UniProtKB/Swiss-Prot annotation:
Its main location: secreted. This is Interleukin-13. PROSITE patterns: INTERLEUKIN_4_13. The lineage of its organism: Eukaryota, Metazoa, Chordata, Craniata, Vertebrata. Residues 1-18 form the signal peptide. It comes from Pan troglodytes (Chimpanzee). GO terms for biological process: immune response; inflammatory response; positive regulation of immunoglobulin production. Interacts with IL13RA2. SUPFAM superfamilies: 4-helical cytokines. Keywords: Cytokine, Disulfide bond, Glycoprotein, Secreted, Signal.
Length: 132
């Protein structure tokens, strides 16, 4: 019985070494890009019923700004995973109705165009090795 208990304790301790650690930023960005590719390729009907979002400045704080725009789209299951993934990149909590200075407040675009623009920008960041 003592041997069995010792074995269980040893396996439990060693299990911690095999447990997954944090996802590297390059992997997380690649997964986000893959998700955006899936969204743009599988588009049969207007994405999110043609909902409009604020255009964003893609040169700084792109993840939080993108999340702030997309968080205001409700009832669109196609972008829910993207919203969750973007929240992993954003260091602060983003809630609906929140606006940052990174929005171009005079310009609204369709979610589909927003996703395409974001995808192109994230691919560029990935090629340049800028993961954060």
């Amino acid at each position: 019985m003592a041997l069995l208990l010792t074995t269980v304790i040893a396996l439990t301790c060693l299990g911690g070494f095999a447990s997954p650690g944090p996802v590297p930023p390059s992997t997380a960005l690649r997964e986000l890009i893959e998700e955006l590719v899936n969204i743009t390729q599988n588009q049969k009907a207007p994405l999110c019923n043609g909902s409009m979002v604020w255009s964003i400045n893609l040169t700084a704080g792109v993840y939080c700004a993108a999340l702030e725009s997309l968080i205001n789209v409700s009832g669109c299951s196609a972008i829910e995973k993207t919203q969750r993934m973007l929240s992993g990149f954003c260091p602060h909590k983003v809630s609906a109705g929140q606006f940052s200075s990174l929005h171009v407040r005079d310009t609204k675009i369709e979610v589909a165009q927003f996703v395409k623009d974001l995808l192109l920008h994230l691919k560029k960041l990935f090629r340049e090795g800028r993961f954060n």
